[in-house]
């Protein structure tokens, strides 16, 4: 069974009002970063990648947020999600670490857990709240540096989530 770390970047927090601008997929040592000015084609490429790579287990930090966006934005574009039910068993690292249904509490962001566990988080690292502004710069001004920053942020989050996942497996909080 192929497993993948999934992370998305969006223009906001509400999938009924905001869009996905980038999707990251980590398969072992391989990172796949998908970005397209058309959200429709971005999602088509994502679901094609999931099928082509045989991904059956989706893992992420606060993956329920990502999944809700992927599901509703695909629905908005009338895209078929093949094998929808098998992804309902996704692994949400935030829920495992937070307990209590994974509800947000101060100090429970990915970077907080990474710093706590010694996973590298540079002080000058971009954070998700900067993505809408970066996307706007790219979309309206063609700012390639803004696009690069979104991709780099996504790659770093994929790597951190993978490192966190490995620690949780090693410590027995997740069984493979």
From Swiss-Prot:
GO molecular function, one term: nucleic acid binding
Family matches, as InterPro entries: RNaseH-like_sf (IPR012337), RNaseH_sf (IPR036397), YprB_RNase_H-like_dom (IPR038720)
Xref: Pfam families: RNase_H_2
PANTHER family according to UniProt: EXONUCLEASE-LIKE PROTEIN, YPRB RIBONUCLEASE H-LIKE DOMAIN-CONTAINING PROTEIN
Name the UniProt record assigns to this protein: Uncharacterized protein MJ0365
């Amino acid at each position: 069974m192929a497993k993948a770390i999934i992370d998305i970047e969006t223009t906001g927090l509400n999938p009924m009002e905001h869009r996905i601008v980038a999707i990251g997929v980590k398969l072992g040592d391989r990172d796949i970063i998908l970005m397209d000015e058309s959200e429709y084609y971005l999602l088509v490429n994502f679901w094609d990648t999931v099928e082509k790579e045989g991904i059956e287990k989706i893992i992420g930090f606060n993956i329920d947020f990502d999944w809700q966006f992927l599901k509703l934005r695909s629905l908005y574009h009338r895209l078929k999600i093949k094998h929808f039910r098998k992804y309902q068993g996704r692994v949400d690292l935030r829920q495992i670490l937070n307990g209590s249904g994974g509800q947000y509490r101060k100090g429970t962001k990915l970077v907080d857990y990474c710093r706590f566990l010694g996973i590298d988080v540079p002080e000058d690292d971009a954070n998700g709240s900067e993505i809408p502004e970066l996307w706007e710069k790219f979309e309206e001004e063609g700012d390639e540096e803004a696009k690069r920053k979104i991709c780099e942020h996504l790659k770093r989050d994929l790597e951190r989530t993978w490192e966190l996942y490995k620690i949780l497996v090693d410590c027995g909080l997740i069984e493979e």
